[in-house]
């Protein structure tokens, strides 16, 4: 589905095996130079992410975060799959999280990564569709239970293109697992590094970018997730996204949603997440954005 007009897809940020780290870093830097130039052409409308294969070399990763910020990019994409490398709850990665927190660089994982499948086998695609969101989101609970958001309370993390209907049950499961029970003593201390519930770290530090897979399931659970944590996108120009029928998709899944919630989904949550220029974007939205009447349940 990589029908991108740009010359790069998301593949550089997915798997840390079967590749030469040096070549992956070279490809990532080529992408990052290009995306910085691309966003510079329309800095108000384009939010660029640097690909940072941080598993291989923490010092290199910090330098790339610094370069990306200095060149106008607003976040990084890291591998969702960690393979045999140290997982993201390892303190060795603290310099990367610190560099991102200090610069307001949002850390991202993008859908797609999963263990290698033999798609010639029966049901392989169905298995992938069930599992891909779990693999993509796996770094999130490493960051939560690993105390990364405790150590770096202003660090921002975003999951993109993973659907949202499954998130409330995952938040509930993390809270249950983190709760103190008389039966959990044998498991050792895995909570003293946390001052809040896992769901509270999610509420404060995490966002969901609902590009491509925003559907009725995601719409109905929006309050269970937290209205301030969800952003909507078109996934342009991929065929699984809303384009070229974005207006119709908006009508299908958003009609009747209260105006304040729509503003969060379509605008203010992204402004908060990425630290955008709200006044300038409101002026631009007045020129090219959808009319409010489009979403009214019973327009006059």
Identify the role of each PLM range.
Residues 71-75, 101-106, 124-128, 152-155, ...:
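Glycine-enriched alpha-helix->loop->beta-strand junction motifs that scaffold or abut catalytic
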Residues 1-146:
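Active-site gating/metal-coordination segments in enzymes
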Residues 26, 33-41, 63-66, 146-147, ...:
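Mid-to-C-terminal alpha-helical segments outside catalytic/metal-binding sites
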Residues 107, 111-115, 145-203:
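Aromatic-lined glycan-binding groove of carbohydrate-active enzymes
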Residues 47-50, 76-78, 107-109, 157-159, ...:
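Hydrophobic faces of well-ordered beta-strands that scaffold small-molecule active sites
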Residues 136-141, 186-191, 210-214:
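A general structural motif
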Residues 123, 173-176, 246-249:
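Short secondary-structure boundary/capping segments
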Residues 36-39, 43-50, 193-205, 287:
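Mobile, glycine- and charge-enriched loop segments
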């Amino acid at each position: 589905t990589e029908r991108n007009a740009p010359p790069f897809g998301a593949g550089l940020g997915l798997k840390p095996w079967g590749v030469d780290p040096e070549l992956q870093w070279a490809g990532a830097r080529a992408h990052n130079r290009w995306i910085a130039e691309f966003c510079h052409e329309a800095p108000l409308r384009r939010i660029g992410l640097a690909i940072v294969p941080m598993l291989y070399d923490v010092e290199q990763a910090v330098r790339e975060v610094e370069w990306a910020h200095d060149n106008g990019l607003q976040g990084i994409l890291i591998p969702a799959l960690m393979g045999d490398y140290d997982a993201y709850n390892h303190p060795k990665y603290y310099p990367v999280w610190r560099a991102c927190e200090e610069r307001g660089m949002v850390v991202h994982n993008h859908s797609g990564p999963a263990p290698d499948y033999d798609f010639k086998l029966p049901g392989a695609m169905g298995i992938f569709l069930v599992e891909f969101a779990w693999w993509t989101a796996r770094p999130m609970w490493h960051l939560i239970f690993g105390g990364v958001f405790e150590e770096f309370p202003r660090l921002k993390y975003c999951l993109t293109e993973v659907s949202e209907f499954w998130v409330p049950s995952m938040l509930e499961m993390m809270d249950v697992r983190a709760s103190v029970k008389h039966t959990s003593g044998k498991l050792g201390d895995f909570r003293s590094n946390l001052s809040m519930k896992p769901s509270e770290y999610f509420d404060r530090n995490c966002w969901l970018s609902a590009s491509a897979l925003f559907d009725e399931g995601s719409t109905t659970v929006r309050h269970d997730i937290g209205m301030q944590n969800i952003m909507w996108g078109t996934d342009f120009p991929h065929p699984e996204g809303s384009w070229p029928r974005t207006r119709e998709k908006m009508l299908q899944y958003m009609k009747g949603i209260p105006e304040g919630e729509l503003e969060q989904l379509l605008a203010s949550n992204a402004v908060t997440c990425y630290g955008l220029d709200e006044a300038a974007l409101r002026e631009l939205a007045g020129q090219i954005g959808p009319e409010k009447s489009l979403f009214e349940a019973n327009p006059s």
